């Protein structure tokens, strides 16, 4: 059964991006310890955010190299962490979705576990995250909220 977690990640996009990089690192390390590398889709709000987090993943987390790529970069080898955004089709069976976009993708139930990043900025992003929480409830999923 799919699991959805809503995680508060600060009050700005910059803090949320750093939080997402740390979360990718934690999930990646857990899978390394199990000798089974899970596939992670890091879904951004748009192409600009995707490029920003692509650069940030070379720095965060410190002391850990995480092979990653933008999903539409055909010149890069396959990686266990792929960065996407709306309008870019994902075709792999990912284990985890880390969603920086306040709206859940229509295929969010295809992931073993979803991490919805919530920026507490009292803006439309936070309202859209609330709507995503309600969508989960409507779909019969009781999400976990971690503040």
Report residues per predicted region:
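Glycine-rich phosphate-binding "P-loop"
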Residues: 1-16
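Short acidic, S/G/P-rich loop/turn micro-motifs used as interaction or catalytic elements
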Residues: 12-14, 48-51, 88-92, 103-109, ...
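A generic structural motif
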Residues: 64-85, 143-147
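Glycine-rich, aromatic-bearing surface loops/beta-hairpins
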Residues: 113-147
């Amino acid at each position: 059964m799919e699991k959805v977690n809503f995680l508060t990640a600060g009050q700005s996009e910059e803090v949320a991006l750093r939080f997402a990089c740390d979360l990718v690192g934690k999930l990646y390390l857990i899978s390394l310890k199990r000798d089974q590398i899970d596939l992670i889709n890091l879904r951004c709000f748009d192409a600009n955010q995707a490029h920003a987090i692509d650069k940030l993943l070379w720095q965060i987390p410190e002391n850990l190299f995480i092979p990653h790529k933008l999903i539409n970069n055909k010149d890069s080898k396959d990686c266990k962490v792929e960065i996407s955004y709306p309008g870019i089709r994902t075709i792999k069976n990912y284990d985890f979705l880390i969603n920086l976009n306040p709206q859940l993708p229509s295929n969010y139930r295809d992931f073993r576990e979803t991490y919805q990043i919530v920026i507490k900025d009292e803006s439309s992003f936070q309202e859209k995250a609330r709507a995503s929480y309600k969508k989960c409830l409507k779909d019969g999923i009781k999400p976990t909220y971690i503040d």
